[in-house]
């Protein structure tokens, strides 16, 4: 459907029932293996290209249809197009129960053709022939009105083909399966489309056999699409989606995208072009062999006879291309194409996207699987990532707002926010970590990635590359973070992952062969990949990669600028409005791809020289138009990135190889193999190290360094109340992660001086972080105020104000409720320690008490309840005060009766009065204490209540303990 929309003219209604296709003369362009055949091939041409389908096609073995199948199809492309058309016409009736017939078809070319295998021959030709020719053929096929009906069925076949197609084989499979399987498969696709797809290409089956899992998954998705009549077009779409799915989920998401594309491409030739482009892109991504190249070439051919599929994709399938480039293509197709099936695919990807790509494999799980950075990616969201994060700044803001939850993912309160925020937080953490880990320039780049990257990543996630990048970034993001020494390699790896998926096998191979070429291709691929899905993660990771390369800033920037140049256009067209989920304009994507290629070429030519000049304009244009954040982020690093690419295209590629391999199911293997040689061992180790950094909040906090300390304490205090039940270690790590934003704020000013453009974004990001921190404080205070209102005592509110002022002193206490209680008990009496242990005090009470003592002393004077404190103990009162602050942070999560710090301050009194209330039923103690204390002062009551909610399980006992100690 998208193809149709893009093409603008649909010769045949995209959704044509098999009967319709029969009624209309089937004008399918069967492109022989030779790509040089005209884009539109008449029935007569089909005779040349009709391909016999081997008997080998098995219904269950979509993978069976593979490159081998393509060869067979090419060999059998003797049948005339008329025969094919006849078969196509016949096929609709036979579709329902033609699974066996499909096989027969494979065996009997003429009969099969009539029965529905007709399409098979077409596909075969396309696959074997050069990608461009094949694409052209596909366009021709799609053009025929008759083909529309077949197309409807075809999507499933295509999906199967896609699923069958393996990494390297997949591109071919797409081309062949789409072409060959398209006609025959579609007929069967109506009823047994999946089988038909398998059948469709006995040869295709062989190819698919290479990668049965990925394509097999796609097959079901394709079944949805069959209604869409785009035979060839549908096939193309199917391929595209499948690839994406493979990239993101492994195969599921990618496949769906391909399938949808198939449906979308049921439109006329123009649609075919779009479809071809999409297909070839996936082909480029997956194909690692000449066959892949051919398939991609065929697709490209349909789009345009451009040697490079990326360029061809961008020109013909601009909107599609964008979508195709990333999961977004599938999403874009779904959004753009009338057929609803497209949308579902997109939704799936986006689910990952928050996934951003990086989160799919690892981050996705994270992006949590943001995916889940999956966004995603995380992307993760994984996922994700990852509904898509609107923008890096937005993501950061959201993360900061949910910082306490991010800091305390384990705490029940944080869990609710963790799902969305978790993804964002993960992404943010990764991004921030990267910022902090690398030098200031690197950090700046990171910040830029955080905001722009988030969006772009989400875009990438949305695009077909989202899956790849989610996977890739999941694995690669950690890798990139893990590779402080050679950040460029990682950035390149992300590019490579995207590029591998995106660029046709032949192109990929070609680019892979020369490190520089590969780098360029990777960069191209990466851009879409970054742009797509795990906006937060993928893009962040991409940016991070850039930042990581910040040390190798020149090189890093070189890669980034090209990547950014590609991404910005995508962002401009589609992603600008959206955070990067669906908004992936094909034209923008095409521009990005072309630009990326151009940039890559420039880099290659000017690897030593500064190619940033050429890449810069695209980057500036794309970055600034698409994302202000991106714009400034990209511009400053551009020269650096260019240099970075120049410096270590090889390193980038190695990273790519490592990351890509995990990223893609199939292509990673072939691509990884190709890149593996290039992969530098240092890159991988660095990647691993970086991954740890990225993953662990500790790493983030470490990165933050001294800057984080002050904000860190404050944040720790806020979030620790919520984390009271969480183990101290986890709390510490999360605390560090939270500190990261604070450090970012501090660094933003420093970064501003370091990199004007990069700093602009980081400064904004940090500023936003600061705002978020302020918001957090506000939320805590507001929650305290709310609780005070709920609480009978006004002093609590007053206390809240004073507590807010004293908050900094409470920071040490923020370590955890258990810590807070331990400190209080230490101040009050040794007995408290044993009782405090009940809540789960992990840290030694003495340490906490020391910290609390110092802070409490400081806070004592301002405390409105100083008289109460004097009654029980100044330190204890202040500790209580500190405690309420923690609950303030906790309150949003628990939202139970949390009383302002004033209550805590009153608490010392309560403890003295409640001494008689020895620990009994905790709830009883709390109630009793509240009554007595309430009589004494409303603040006391509120204090008790506040503590209860703060620590639902142990809070009351702790209060009781404190009281008894008092």
Curated annotation (Swiss-Prot):
One matching Pfam family: MLIP
Database matches in InterPro entries: MLIP
Segments of skewed composition (Polar residues): 195-207, 325-337, 507-521, 639-649, 657-684, 798-810, 937-946
Localization, UniProt: Nucleus; Nucleus envelope; Nucleus, PML body; Cytoplasm, Cytosol
A biological process from GO: negative regulation of transcription by RNA polymerase II
Spans annotated as Required for interaction with ISL1: 144-810
Membrane topology reported for the UniProt record: Peripheral membrane protein
Keyword Cell membrane recorded: yes
Highest taxon in the source lineage: Eukaryota
Tissue specificity note: Expressed in cardiomyoctes. Expression is highly reduced in hypertrophic cardiomyocytes.
Modified residues (Phosphoserine): 129, 486, 791
Lineage: Eukaryota, Metazoa, Chordata, Craniata, Vertebrata
Basic and acidic residues bias (residue ranges): 542-555, 597-607, 957-966
Gene transcribed to yield this protein: Mlip
Region annotated Disordered, chain positions: 132-154, 182-207, 303-337, 354-388, 434-562, 597-684, 785-837, 929-966
Cellular component terms (Gene Ontology): cytosol; nuclear envelope; nuclear lumen; nucleus; PML body; sarcolemma
Keywords, ordered alphabetically: Cell membrane, Cytoplasm, Membrane, Nucleus, Phosphoprotein
Function: Required for myoblast differentiation into myotubes, possibly acting as a transcriptional regulator of the myogenic program. Required for cardiac adaptation to stress through integrated regulation of the AKT/mTOR pathways and FOXO1. Regulates cardiac homeostasis and plays a role in the protection against cardiac hypertrophy. Binds chromatin. May act as a transcriptional cofactor for ISL1, repressing its transcriptional activity. May also repress MYOCD transcriptional activity.
GO MF term set: lamin binding; transcription corepressor activity
Biased composition (Low complexity): 354-387, 437-455, 478-497, 785-797, 825-834
UniProt keyword annotation of Cell membrane present: yes
Subunit structure: Directly interacts with LMNA. Interacts with ISL1 (via N-terminal domain); the interaction represses ISL1 transactivator activity. Interactions of ISL1 with MLIP1 and GCN5/KAT2A may be mutually exclusive.
Name of the protein described by the UniProt record: Muscular LMNA-interacting protein
């Amino acid at each position: 459907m998208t193809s149709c929309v893009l093409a603008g003219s649909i010769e045949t209604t995209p959704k044509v029932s098999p009967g319709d296709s029969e009624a209309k003369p089937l004008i399918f362009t069967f492109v022989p293996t030779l790509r040089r055949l005209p884009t539109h091939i008449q029935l007569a041409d089909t005779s040349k290209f009709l391909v016999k389908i081997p008997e080998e096609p098995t219904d269950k073995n979509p993978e069976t249809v593979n490159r081998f199948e393509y060869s067979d199809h090419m060999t059998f492309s003797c049948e005339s197009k008329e025969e094919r058309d006849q078969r196509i016409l016949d096929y609709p009736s036979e579709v329902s129960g033609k699974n066996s017939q499909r096989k027969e078809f494979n065996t009997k070319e003429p009969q099969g053709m009539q029965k529905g295998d007709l399409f098979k021959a077409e596909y075969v030709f396309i696959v074997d022939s050069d990608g461009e020719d094949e694409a052209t053929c596909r366009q021709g096929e799609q053009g025929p009105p008759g083909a529309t009906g077949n197309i409807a069925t075809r999507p499933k076949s295509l999906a199967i083909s896609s699923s069958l197609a393996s990494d390297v084989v997949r591109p071919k499979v797409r081309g062949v399966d789409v072409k060959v399987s398209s006609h025959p498969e579609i007929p069967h696709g109506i009823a047994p489309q999946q089988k038909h797809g398998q059948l469709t290409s006995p040869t295709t089956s062989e190819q698919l056999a290479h990668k049965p899992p990925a394509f097999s998954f796609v097959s079901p998705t394709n079944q949805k699409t069959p209604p869409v009549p785009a035979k060839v077009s549908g096939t193309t779409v199917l391929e595209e989606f499948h690839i994406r799915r493979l990239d993101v989920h492994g195969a599921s998401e990618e496949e769906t995208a391909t399938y949808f594309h198939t449906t979308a491409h049921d439109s006329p030739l123009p649609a075919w072009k779009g479809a071809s482009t999409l297909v070839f892109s996936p082909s480029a991504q997956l194909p690692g062999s000449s066959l892949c190249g051919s398939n991609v070439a065929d697709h490209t051919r349909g789009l345009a006879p451009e040697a490079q599929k990326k360029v061809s994709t961008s020109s013909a399938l601009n909107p599609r291309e964008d979508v195709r480039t990333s999961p977004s293509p599938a999403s874009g197709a779904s959004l753009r194409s009338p057929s609803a099936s497209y949308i579902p695919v997109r939704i799936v990807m986006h689910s990952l996207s928050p996934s951003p790509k990086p989160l799919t494999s690892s981050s996705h799980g994270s992006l949590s699987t943001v995916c889940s950075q999956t966004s995603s990616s995380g992307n993760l969201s994984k996922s994700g990532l990852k509904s898509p994060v609107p923008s890096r700044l937005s993501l950061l803001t959201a993360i900061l707002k949910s910082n306490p939850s991010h800091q305390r993912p384990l705490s029940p309160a944080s869990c609710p926010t963790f799902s969305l925020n978790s993804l964002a937080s993960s992404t943010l953490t990764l991004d921030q970590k990267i910022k902090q880990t690398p030098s200031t320039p690197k950090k700046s780049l990171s910040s830029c990635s955080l905001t722009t990257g988030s969006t772009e990543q989400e875009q990438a996630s949305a695009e077909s590359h989202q899956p790849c990048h989610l996977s890739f970034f999941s694995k690669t993001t950690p890798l990139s973070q893990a590779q402080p020494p050679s950040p460029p390699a990682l950035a390149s790896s992300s590019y490579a992952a995207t590029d591998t998926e995106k660029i046709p096998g032949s192109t990929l191979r070609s680019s892979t062969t020369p490190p520089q070429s590969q780098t360029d291709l990777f960069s191209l691929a990466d851009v879409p990949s970054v742009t797509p899905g795990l906006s937060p993660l993928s893009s962040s990771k991409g940016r991070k990669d850039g930042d990581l390369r910040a040390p190798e800033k020149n090189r890093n920037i070189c890669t980034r600028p090209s990547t950014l140049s590609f991404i910005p256009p995508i962002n401009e067209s589609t992603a600008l409005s959206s955070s990067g989920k669906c908004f992936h304009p094909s034209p923008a994507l095409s521009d990005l791809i072309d630009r990326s290629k151009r940039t890559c070429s420039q880099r290659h030519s000017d690897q030593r020289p500064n190619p940033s000049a050429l890449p810069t304009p695209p980057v500036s244009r794309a970055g600034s138009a698409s994302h202000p954040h991106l714009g400034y982020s990209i511009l400053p690093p551009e020269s650096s990135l260019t240099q970075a690419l120049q410096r270590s295209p090889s390193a980038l590629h190695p990273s790519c190889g490592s990351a890509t391999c995990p990223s893609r199911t199939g292509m990673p293997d072939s691509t990884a193999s190709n890149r593996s040689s290039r992969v530098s061992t240092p890159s991988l180790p660095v990647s691993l190290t970086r991954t740890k950094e990225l993953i662990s909040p500790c790493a983030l906090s470490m990165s933050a360094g001294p800057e984080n300390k002050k904000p860190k304490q404050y944040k720790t205090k806020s979030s620790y109340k919520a984390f009271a039940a969480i183990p101290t270690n986890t709390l510490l790590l999360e605390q560090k992660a939270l500190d990261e934003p604070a450090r970012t704020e501090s660094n933003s000013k420093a970064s501003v001086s370091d990199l004007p453009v990069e700093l602009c974004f980081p400064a904004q990001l940090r500023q936003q972080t600061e705002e978020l921190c302020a918001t957090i404080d506000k939320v805590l205070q507001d929650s305290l105020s709310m609780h005070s209102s709920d609480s009978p005592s006004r002093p609590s509110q007053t206390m809240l104000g004073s507590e807010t002022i004293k908050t900094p002193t409470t920071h040490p206490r923020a370590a955890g409720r258990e810590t807070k209680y331990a400190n209080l008990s230490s101040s009050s009496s040794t007995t408290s320690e044993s009782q405090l242990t009940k809540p789960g005090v992990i840290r030694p009470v003495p340490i906490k008490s020391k910290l609390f003592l110092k802070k409490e002393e400081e806070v004592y004077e301002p405390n409105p309840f100083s008289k109460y404190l004097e009654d029980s103990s100044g330190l204890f009162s202040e500790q209580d005060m500190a405690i309420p602050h923690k609950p303030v942070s906790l309150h949003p999560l628990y939202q139970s009766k949390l009383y302002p710090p004033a209550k805590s301050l009153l608490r010392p009194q309560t403890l003295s009065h409640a001494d008689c209330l020895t620990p009994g039923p905790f709830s009883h103690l709390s109630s009793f204490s509240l009554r007595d204390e309430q009589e004494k002062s409303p603040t006391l009551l509120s204090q008790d209540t506040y503590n209860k909610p703060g620590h639902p399980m142990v809070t009351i006992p702790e209060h009781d303990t404190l009281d008894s100690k008092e």
